[in-house]
């Protein structure tokens, strides 16, 4: 079973963070727009169970993603199942229709501009995202995807990189939660 080990931090100065990442040998990509359409479950409250179901549009690619509840009190570590939706916009629309037919209802769309980098750190390749989230703010995310038996060392690795980048004030709420709080 695969888990996403993630830490997210508010970022007042993305340019300064990009410079720190460059100093670590990481090249930051150009901006890419991402739109996440989140769904509510017909029989349980995802806000209470700390789960999420979304369809992400990233350029001409689409993904269906389920995120399970966070499993600790300090990071955003959780089970993640992500499926690519081949067939572009038509397939994403078909999945949206299927989910609606099953009783799932759209909750909100999260719009962001994301730049990515990968940092080699403690023998791992950590994915770093610099995010500008519409109506929410700017953030940096550090992420590893690992098997269950590797969770503790992965969390320590991500925390170590966060310390090296002088990041503080971790944010455990999702962009959806932050957006809905501002609505």
Task: Name what the model sees in each region.
Residues 147-174:
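Mixed-charge, glycine-accented linear interaction segment located at domain edges/termini
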Residues 2-5:
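Extreme N-terminal starter segment of soluble prokaryotic enzymes
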Residues 16-18, 22-31, 45-49, 54-118, ...:
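Charged surface patches that recognize polyanionic ligands
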Residues 116-136:
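Charged, well-structured binding/catalytic surfaces in domain cores that contact anionic ligands
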Residues 8, 52-56, 65-69, 128-133, ...:
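A structural feature that tracks compact, well-ordered secondary-structure segments
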Residues 10-15, 87-90, 147-151:
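Helix N-cap motif at beta-to-alpha junctions
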Residues 35-42, 114-117, 172-183:
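Short proline/glycine- and acidic-rich turn/helix-capping motifs at secondary-structure junctions
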